């Protein structure tokens, strides 16, 4: 037993006042600063991983890189020295190239002529809008257009514009349905045949071919035509009242149909009154409504502001565009007692004694939309022209107007209209997509052979009363619809969807309204006397262009 070492019991401290050790250990433990953004690596790597060449400090700490923050345990003061306040440049932490564009495979920025210089010749030399790309120092290409919006990032800083509704929604109106534009864009009603004429009224004058020669060197001033255009609603049309007794169950005008069929391109608010009487539906408009005014730059990035008293406000520009369209459509015709006219079967239903009416021919046409839905609409032509084979071709004459190219940041017509007419039309398609689509739909519904577009500009950007004609252009409505990406099957589908929605409702009055601030269509059930207060001024609203010569 003596050969073994004796067993000595270890000393165990006993804490009478608590638990844990009785003596506090040494507190002078050095503190190592750290950074919370450091990437966590492995504690020990037995595989001897090869360090990265591109980012050698990938797993290194980014806190305390300067030597003055390093910890050295020394008891004496022999190593005491002053701290250099300048410090060295800290190593940037490792970050992935998340927001850095990869320029290695960017062909557009390098081109084929050099590593970093864009090839101007390969890009066409100029943009579609007419702005040429300028090359700055060190070969970096920069586009000088839209420089005032370069500070914005994807339009985040753009102010939100709150538009007003076309009609004030009352508390006693009942909301029936809300349909957003993405749902409407998926609709389609194919294989709709061309409309069949059931009545033709009025007369038309022939187009003056001298206006096809108008250009920037040979511009013509726009005259003020003292002619009256009646904008009669659907229910007040005597021909539609006569036809509704024997045929059809849906009645409307071409302006109302084009507004509904092109609703997915609209930004401004509008409304259409619907009256359901048994199996018949009448699509109508309110009295004293601004429904017949043409919008200006509705679909542009920066539409006109609503400034009272300004000639460039949204309402002033709409009035100006409407008068320009009326005057241009009558000026380009061969007017005179000795000039020939094309007469329809019936006289103008809105003719009044002693009133000089505008040259407009009305065609009441019928379409079969399926499921016992028969549409009858009043369409119109503005003129006729002698075809190459001696036949008569119907025209829809419209006018685009330029008010201030610097304010709208668009192509200046007086510089680009003769040489780059496609760029001018592309700019108008971008700024007035809804208006051009409506004109195209109206021409297709009426069966026009040609769509005449005139380019009218102000003589002075500050004068909204005097204008000049800078040129004209013609299209076939069906081909132009394809160019502007207008799908007629979708347009018929949108119309049929709203008609079916109203057909399922009981008899009464309804309102289809475009939401002023959302891409959405709303259907309301309104009282029978909702808009009767506007009917007292029916006569004034029926001819808003009768005094166009006073403006």
Swiss-Prot record:
Q: Principal place where this protein is found?
A: cytoplasm
Question: Which residue intervals make up region (Disordered)?
Answer: 91-154, 527-551
- Bias class Acidic residues marks the residues at 531-542
* A molecular function GO annotation: mRNA cap binding
Please name the Pfam families in this protein's record.
eIF-3_zeta
Location of the region described as RNA gate in the Swiss-Prot/TrEMBL record = 290-304
> Which keywords fit this entry according to its UniProt record?
Cytoplasm, Initiation factor, Protein biosynthesis, RNA-binding
A GO cellular-component term linked to this record: eukaryotic 43S preinitiation complex
InterPro entries linked: eIF3d (IPR007783)
Here the segments flagged for biased composition (Basic residues) are 95-113
Q: What domain of life does the UniProt record list for this protein's source? A: Eukaryota
**Compartments, record wording:** Cytoplasm
User: What does the sequence similarity comment in the record state about its family?
Assistant: Belongs to the eIF-3 subunit D family.
Q: What does this protein do?
A: mRNA cap-binding component of the eukaryotic translation initiation factor 3 (eIF-3) complex, which is involved in protein synthesis of a specialized repertoire of mRNAs and, together with other initiation factors, stimulates binding of mRNA and methionyl-tRNAi to the 40S ribosome. The eIF-3 complex specifically targets and initiates translation of a subset of mRNAs involved in cell proliferation. In the eIF-3 complex, eif3d specifically recognizes and binds the 7-methylguanosine cap of a subset of mRNAs.
Question: By its UniProt entry, which HAMAP family does this protein fall under?
Answer: eIF3d
Q: What is this protein called?
A: Eukaryotic translation initiation factor 3 subunit D-2
Species in which this protein is naturally found: Drosophila melanogaster
Q: What is the lineage of its organism?
A: Eukaryota, Metazoa, Ecdysozoa, Arthropoda, Hexapoda
């Amino acid at each position: 037993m003596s050969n073994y070492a004796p067993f000595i019991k270890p000393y165990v401290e006993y804490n009478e006042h608590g638990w844990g050790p009785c003596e506090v250990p040494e507190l002078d433990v050095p503190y190592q600063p750290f950074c919370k953004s450091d990437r966590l690596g492995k504690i020990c790597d037995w595989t001897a991983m090869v360090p990265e060449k591109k980012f050698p400090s990938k797993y290194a700490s980014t806190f305390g890189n300067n030597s003055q923050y390093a910890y050295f345990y020394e008891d004496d003061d022999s190593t005491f020295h002053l701290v250099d306040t300048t410090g060295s440049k800290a190593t940037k932490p490792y970050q992935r190239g998340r927001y850095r564009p990869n320029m290695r495979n960017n062909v557009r920025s390098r081109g084929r002529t050099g590593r970093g210089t864009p090839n101007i010749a390969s890009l066409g030399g100029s943009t579609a809008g007419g702005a040429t790309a300028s090359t700055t120092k060190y070969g970096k290409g920069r586009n000088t257009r839209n420089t005032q919006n370069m500070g914005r990032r994807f339009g985040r800083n753009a102010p939100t514009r709150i538009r007003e509704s076309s009609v004030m929604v009352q508390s006693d109106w009942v909301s029936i349905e809300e349909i957003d534009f993405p749902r409407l864009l998926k609709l389609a009603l194919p294989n709709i045949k061309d409309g069949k004429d059931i009545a033709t009224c009025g007369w038309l004058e022939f187009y003056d071919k001298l206006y096809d020669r108008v250009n920037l060197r040979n511009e013509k001033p726009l005259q003020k035509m003292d002619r009256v255009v009646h904008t009669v609603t659907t229910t007040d049309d005597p021909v539609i009242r006569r036809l509704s007794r024997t045929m059809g169950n849906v009645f409307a005008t071409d302006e109302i149909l084009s507004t509904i069929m092109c609703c997915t391109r609209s930004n401004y608010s509008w409304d259409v009154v619907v009256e359901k009487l048994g199996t018949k539906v009448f699509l109508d408009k309110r009295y004293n409504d601004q429904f017949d005014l043409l919008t200006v730059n509705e679909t542009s990035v920066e539409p006109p502001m609503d400034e009272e008293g300004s000639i460039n406000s949204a309402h002033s520009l709409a009035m100006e565009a409407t008068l320009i369209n009326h005057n241009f459509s009558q000026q380009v015709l061969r007017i005179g007692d000795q000039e020939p006219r094309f007469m329809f079967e019936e006289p103008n239903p809105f003719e009044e004694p002693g009133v000089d009416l505008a040259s407009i021919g009305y065609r009441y046409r019928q379409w079969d939309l399926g499921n016992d839905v028969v549409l009858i609409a009043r369409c119109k032509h503005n003129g006729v022209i002698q075809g190459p084979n001696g036949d008569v071709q119907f025209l829809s004459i419209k006018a685009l107007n330029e008010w201030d190219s610097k304010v709208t940041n668009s192509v200046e017509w007086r510089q680009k209209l003769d040489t780059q007419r496609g760029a001018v039309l592309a700019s108008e398609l971008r700024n007035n997509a809804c208006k051009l689509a409506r004109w195209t739909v109206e021409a297709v519904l009426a069966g026009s052979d040609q769509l005449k577009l005139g380019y009218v500009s102000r003589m002075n950007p500050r004068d909204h009363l005097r204008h000049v004609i800078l040129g004209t252009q013609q299209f076939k409505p069906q081909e132009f619809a394809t160019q502007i990406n207008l799908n007629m099957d979708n347009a018929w589908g949108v119309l049929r969807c709203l008609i079916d929605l109203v057909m399922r409702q009981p008899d009464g009055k309804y309102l289809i309204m475009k939401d002023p601030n959302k891409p959405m269509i709303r259907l309301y059930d309104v009282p029978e006397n909702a808009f009767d207060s506007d009917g007292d001024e029916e006569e004034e609203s029926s001819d808003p262009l009768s005094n166009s010569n006073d403006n």
